[in-house]
């Protein structure tokens, strides 16, 4: 939560007034936070404890310097990285808000488990259009994905695909000899 990695968090004076951020983690520089009344800092919790006690309606996957986009080294890294916080938020049964250009944005869209945005400034409009029914459909899908994560479904699927690929490659290599 340090300033260099999450500078956008420290610009809460630009936060739409109906938002309230509930933040968990280490390294927050509280003296740099603007408009603290829209912000709750809950400190660090181990993953298992966070999963059972998190407060909120969405998990925000956003890093970098700016509200306008995930910029800077940390923000740009979201284009390539699959951040742990996505899985953590899913395990917490929280639909996601993620940068449109993040590596995981296509998965979020395909599974309909969150909202993809280019800028945090778009969020008000997206949330205003979201019906209660739409939110609970998203949340239900998140719970389905969470259940799959909890039993290692995605790991097993990736491992099976890797073994099939390597086995196919070995057979092809043997045919050349």
Predicted ranges, named:
Residues 111-117:
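A short acidic/histidine/glycine-rich donor-binding loop in glycosyltransferase catalytic cores
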Residues 49-53, 124-131:
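Short amphipathic alpha-helix with an adjacent loop that forms part of the alpha/beta core around
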Residues 15-16, 90, 109:
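Anion (oxyanion) recognition and catalysis
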Residues 118-121, 125, 132-174:
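A charged, aromatic-enriched C-terminal amphipathic alpha-helix characteristic of glycosyltransferases
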């Amino acid at each position: 939560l340090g300033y260099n990695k999450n500078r956008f968090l420290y610009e809460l004076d630009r936060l739409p007034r109906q938002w309230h951020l509930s933040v968990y983690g280490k390294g927050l520089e509280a003296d740099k936070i603007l408009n603290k009344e829209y912000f709750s800092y809950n400190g660090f919790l181990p993953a298992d404890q966070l999963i059972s006690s998190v407060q909120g309606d969405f998990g925000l996957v956003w890093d970098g310097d700016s509200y306008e986009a995930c910029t800077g080294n940390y923000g740009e890294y979201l284009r390539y990285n699959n951040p742990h916080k996505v899985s953590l938020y899913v395990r917490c049964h929280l639909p996601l808000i993620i940068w449109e250009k993040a590596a995981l944005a296509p998965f979020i869209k395909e599974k309909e488990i969150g909202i993809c945005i280019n800028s945090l400034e778009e969020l008000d409009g997206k949330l205003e259009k979201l019906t209660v029914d739409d939110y609970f459909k998203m949340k239900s899908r998140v719970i389905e994905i969470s259940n799959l994560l909890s039993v290692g479904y995605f790991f097993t699927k990736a491992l099976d695909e890797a073994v099939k690929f390597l086995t196919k490659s070995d057979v092809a290599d043997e045919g050349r000899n």
